[in-house]
């Protein structure tokens, strides 16, 4: 476990100016894939939380306390995510920023629920992350979990899938759609949401298949899609397998439009897929780096040599929201903090004002389309 635990990443509490006494410290857990194939996303969560804590502490901390961070590496693995969650419990952590993957967030959040902890995910979009608070959800959550204290800063799969379906239909590509997923709660959840949105408008997918995370050879799948003469390949999954799939489509001469969701929002997608990623379509909220509220923070990141793409600023915002909710509660008690979040807001964040509904979802989710294009000497995603 120690190899997955970032002890050195904790921020050291400062000294009170009066008498140079040590300030009381409130430790927040940050969980994500800091190693492994999705480490680029883990770095986004880590850097965002670190910068937010630095700025919050510089402004006086929270209720006289300085914030500190402790990191748990879940390697995008559900079992490891549960281990990280249990480690947080053992360390007395009561608040968590994370996890990244829906498939890790869901089981880890059960540990947090059982131990009265509050968590905010910057990125997990599966609907059951929050919906199960109010009632049964999907195949695995048969009962409501009213004591769940789980929030997110991002939108949901059903919202993202609706945008994708509208585009496919509006562009006249709906007669030959292949929906492919990676069998994870995120990937299959997103694929199913898109498929359902298409079906709600009378469109049936020509193909619907799942692959396994870690697969590298998709030649048989590509051949099958060529035979079906698909015009659009909708991918529910992350950048690793997505990059390999789009590259092998190009290698085999399949010219179908490749489309996916927020799981490929990393320059690693282009590193893996190469020139074949040009023309890929992707759904993600409007680029947070271009928000006026983020201008100064983006400059700080860029000065440090880090590009705050994708979920970096979402992690920053999650930390801001947590700090503001603790302040509103008057103490660092998870239940009292949650009461300041459910149905409450707005919270002033780097993403703009954010409010929550009674489930822990944000009230203003918005997804737009991006196209992967060559900009200068690199291929990256550009908002349409």
Cite the ranges covered by each PLM segment:
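Extracytosolic ligand-binding ectodomains
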Residues: 2-9, 23-384
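Hydrophobic helical h-region of N-terminal Sec-dependent signal peptides
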Residues: 10-17
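Sec/Tat signal peptide C-region and signal peptidase I cleavage site
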Residues: 17-23
């Amino acid at each position: 476990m120690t190899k997955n635990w970032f002890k050195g990443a904790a921020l050291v509490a400062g000294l009170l100016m009066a008498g140079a006494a040590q300030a009381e410290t409130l430790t927040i857990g940050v969980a994500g894939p800091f190693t492994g194939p999705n480490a680029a996303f883990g770095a986004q969560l880590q850097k965002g939380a670190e910068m937010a804590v630095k700025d919050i502490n510089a402004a006086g901390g929270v209720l006289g306390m300085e914030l500190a961070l402790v990191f748990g590496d879940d390697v995008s693995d559900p079992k490891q995510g549960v281990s990280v969650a249990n480690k947080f419990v053992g360390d007395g952590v009561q608040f968590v920023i994370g996890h990244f993957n829906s498939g890790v967030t869901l089981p880890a959040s059960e540990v947090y629920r059982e131990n009265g902890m509050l968590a905010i995910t910057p990125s997990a979009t599966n609907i059951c992350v929050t919906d199960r608070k109010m009632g049964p959800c999907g195949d695995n959550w048969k009962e409501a979990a009213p004591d769940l204290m789980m929030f997110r800063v991002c939108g949901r799969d059903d919202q993202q899938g609706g945008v994708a379906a509208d585009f496919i239909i509006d562009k006249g590509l709906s007669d030959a759609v292949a929906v492919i997923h990676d069998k994870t709660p995120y990937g299959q959840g997103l694929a199913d949401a898109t498929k359902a949105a298409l079906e709600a408008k009378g469109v049936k997918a020509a193909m619907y298949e799942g692959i396994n995370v870690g697969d590298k050879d998709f030649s048989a799948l590509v051949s099958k899609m060529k035979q079906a003469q698909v015009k659009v390949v909708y991918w529910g999954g992350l950048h690793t397998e997505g990059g390999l799939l789009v590259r092998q489509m190009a290698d085999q001469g399949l010219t179908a439009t490749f489309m996916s969701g927020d799981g490929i929002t990393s320059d690693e997608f282009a590193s893996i897929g190469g020139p074949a990623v040009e023309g890929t379509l992707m759904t993600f909220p409007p680029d947070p780096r271009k928000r006026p509220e983020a201008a100064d923070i983006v400059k700080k990141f860029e000065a440090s040599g880090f590009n705050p793409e994708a979920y970096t600023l979402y992690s920053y915002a999650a930390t801001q929201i947590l700090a503001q909710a603790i302040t509103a509660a008057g103490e660092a008690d998870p239940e009292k903090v949650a009461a300041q979040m459910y149905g409450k807001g707005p919270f002033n964040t780097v993403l703009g004002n954010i409010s929550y509904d009674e489930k822990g979802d944000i009230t203003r989710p918005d997804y737009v389309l991006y196209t992967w294009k060559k900009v200068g000497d690199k291929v990256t995603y550009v908002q349409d």
